[in-house]
From Swiss-Prot:
GO biological process: positive regulation of translational elongation; positive regulation of translational termination; translational elongation
Places the protein is found: Cytoplasm
Function: Translation factor that promotes translation elongation and termination, particularly upon ribosome stalling at specific amino acid sequence contexts. Binds between the exit (E) and peptidyl (P) site of the ribosome and promotes rescue of stalled ribosome: specifically required for efficient translation of polyproline-containing peptides as well as other motifs that stall the ribosome. Acts as a ribosome quality control (RQC) cofactor by joining the RQC complex to facilitate peptidyl transfer during CAT tailing step.
Protein name: Eukaryotic translation initiation factor 5A
Matching InterPro entries: IF5A-like, IF5A-like_N, NA-bd_OB-fold, Rib_uL2_dom2, Trans_elong_IF5A_hypusine_site, Transl_elong_IF5A_C, Translation_prot_SH3-like_sf
GO CC annotations on file: cytoplasm
Entry keywords, A to Z: Cytoplasm, Elongation factor, Hypusine, Protein biosynthesis, RNA-binding
Pfam entry (one): eIF-5a
Organism: Candida albicans (strain SC5314 / ATCC MYA-2876)
PROSITE patterns, per the entry: IF5A_HYPUSINE
Processing and modification events after translation: Lys-51 undergoes hypusination, a unique post-translational modification that consists in the addition of a butylamino group from spermidine to lysine side chain, leading to the formation of the unusual amino acid hypusine. eIF-5As are the only known proteins to undergo this modification, which is essential for their function.
Cited Gene3D superfamilies: 2.30.30.30, Nucleic acid-binding proteins
Amino acid sequence: MAEEDHTFETADAGAALTFPMQCSALRKNGHVVIKNRPCKIVDMSTSKTGKHGHAKVHLVAIDIFTGKKLEDLSPSTHNMEVPNVSRQEFQLLDIDDGYLSLMTADGDTKDDVKVPEGELGDKLQSEFDEGKDLIVTIISAMGEEAAISYKEAPKGSA
């Protein structure tokens, strides 16, 4: 039998997209899944136990990719999904056709992240056009990725 080379092109080690957490354990500035969207909790309040039921947790959260506000009301004993959110920094190589061309830490290129919309994307484009070396922060959760910030690379790092 011939030896076969197996290559696996995954960035995560098969980690689940989300994990369960009891409502009462969620915290402000933490993450939660509401209506199948990864969100950052901006406000939460708890109502007292009623005559017929459990204490309720009222969550107000912002979608980490779209910025839309979402709300949820759940019994404090229920489990909610929490997204696995990761942040990585990449060096910006090029901006082409609405996508960022980024270099990973091991020298590979990553070309599947869109230029962010609005002011962030405009500033990123103009500073790149000025010839600045930029480091872009990419946030990823539940199979989606987006550039959320950038900074100028320290001189002499490239």
